[in-house]
């Protein structure tokens, strides 16, 4: 199944591709510039190549030329005239397009998040919360913080300390988010979406 979903959320468009195709299938009907061909060939992982091609299919779904996408020296994706954020997890690839800064992240809900939780958040799940809910809650927190990291325009942002979800309500679809930094604090709004086995979150300026 190729193109999976298009969502319009306020002033943001989110496009999702469910990756089921091989590289050869993804190349069909997708002309690439010489620069894009060189970048594709430089990717030695088939998974990375498939993601690269899926992103360009999504740009075409958004009626944008694939060559409109470029990256800063820090590796952040850029478009002229609007903001873009890109994420992928297992067989899903997503892009978000907006006229204001936007961050997006998708993650598969896996038990290993419980081992990693103390490394990225001070929040602790209540002792009476069942394991499945804990996995989903920590995955939600991770996606919000990852989306915050992508939207951050401060230098040297610390993932644990500076990216915060100060009043986290597990599995609530809307969350407050905050970047604290010596150059100033900035508040954001977070939205989370729950698919079977996956959680993705989007962060934008308030």
Where in this protein do the model-derived segments appear?
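Core catalytic alpha/beta fold that binds nucleotide/phospho-ligands
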Residues: 1-206
